[in-house]
Structure formats: structure tokens, C-alpha cells
Design a protein with these regions (language model features):
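Basic, Lys/Arg- and aromatic-enriched nucleic-acid-binding interface segment
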Residues: 1-25, 33, 59, 68-70
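C-terminal catalytic core of tyrosine-transesterase DNA break-rejoin enzymes
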Residues: 10, 14-21, 107, 114-118, ...
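Phosphate-coordinating loops and pocket residues in cytosolic domains that bind phosphorylated ligands
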Residues: 24, 32, 161, 165, ...
Length: 183
């Protein structure tokens, strides 16, 4: 497995970053000293209505999904260490390639599907990493407002309704907390 793809997959799992944000992420936006990633751009494939034949889409790097998607994501020690080991000389290099050429989201999605299928996992998409990050963050006790900001959501309702999946174990743990109040 190429190290850049693996690093991108692990970074997404550690931060909840969107695929388009990761594909547009350059090393100049990663600070291992501050242990943070600054999200200010996203890469997306758009339909090009001006083309009648041939390639009907084009790649655009622009602002992320919403105003709240422009954010700083703190990194774990693991993610920071990974970035320190990976960082190339050029700060203009993209995180996923180590060069000044970006990787398309569908290429990264294709690679992830191949790797997970080789591990016997079916139906894993890149967005699954974001869901997993959010669910695990809640399980370890993240405050939902902070998690919502890390994910770049416009409201905590989006975070709770779409990304947080309560497990039976978490429900049991929460029920046991009632012992504290004598119930």
C-alpha cells in the first residue's frame, strides 16, 4: 500500500475530515508544532455544462462546504507523529501525494474500497471514516459542541442526527451513571 494513501486514510480516521478537504489539504495547512490542521479548501468534481462531448466534469479547488467548514482541527499525538514522519520539503505539496499534484476524491475512494475489500470488509466508503470518528469521539466523552465544530457542521443537530451512532455498550454505560443519583 502506498504510504500516502495510508496516511490519508489514517488522518481521516483521526480527524473526521471530509474527502474533498483531505484531497485539497497541503502541508502548509498542517502544523505539527501546533498539532493542528487548518481546513480552508476543498476539492470537488463538478459537472461542466459548457462541454457537450468528452469530459463532462472538472476538478475545482475552492472553499469548503460552508462557512463553519473553514476551521482548525486539533490533532492527536498519533496523527501529529504521522504527519511529522510524512512531511516533505515543500509546504506546497499535497498531503495525499507528497507532490504539488493533488489526488482526486474518487481515486482515494477507489483505493480505500480495494484495501477494505482485501481485508474482507464490504460497503466501506470514505465517509464511513467520518462517521466512525464522530461515533468514537462521543463514546470517549467528547462534548458535542466541540465535536460539531471539529466536523465543520453548522449545528450540533447535524452532528447528532447524522453522525453519532449510539452503541448498546454506550447506552449501558450511560444507564449505569444513574447509580450516582440513586436510581
Amino acid at each position: 500500500m502506498p504510504i500516502w494513501y495510508l496516511a490519508g486514510i489514517l488522518l481521516a480516521l483521526c480527524t473526521g475530515i471530509r474527502i474533498g478537504e483531505l484531497c485539497a489539504l497541503q502541508w502548509e495547512s498542517v502544523s505539527t508544532n501546533d498539532k493542528a490542521i487548518r481546513i480552508a479548501k476543498a476539492l470537488q468534481r463538478l459537472h461542466d455544462t459548457s462541454v457537450s462531448q468528452g469530459a463532462r466534469t472538472r476538478i475545482v479547488i475552492g472553499p469548503p462546504k460552508s462557512d463553519t467548514s473553514v476551521r482548525t482541527i486539533p490533532m492527536t499525538e498519533y496523527a501529529t507523529g504521522l504527519c511529522r514522519r510524512m512531511k516533505p520539503q515543500s509546504s506546497a505539496a499535497y498531503v495525499l501525494t507528497g507532490t504539488e499534484a493533488f489526488m482526486e476524491p474518487r481515486t482515494l475512494q477507489y483505493r480505500l474500497e480495494k484495501y477494505t475489500q482485501a481485508c474482507g470488509l464490504e460497503g466501506v466508503h470514505f465517509h464511513t471514516l467520518r462517521h466512525t470518528f464522530a461515533t468514537r469521539a462521543v463514546e470517549v466523552g467528547f462534548e458535542v459542541k466541540s465535536l460539531s465544530e471539529i466536523l465543520g457542521h453548522t449545528s450540533v443537530t447535524i452532528t447528532l442526527d447524522r453522525y453519532v451512532h449510539a452503541s448498546l455498550e454506550l447506552k449501558r454505560d450511560n444507564m449505569q451513571k444513574l447509580k450516582v443519583v440513586g436510581l
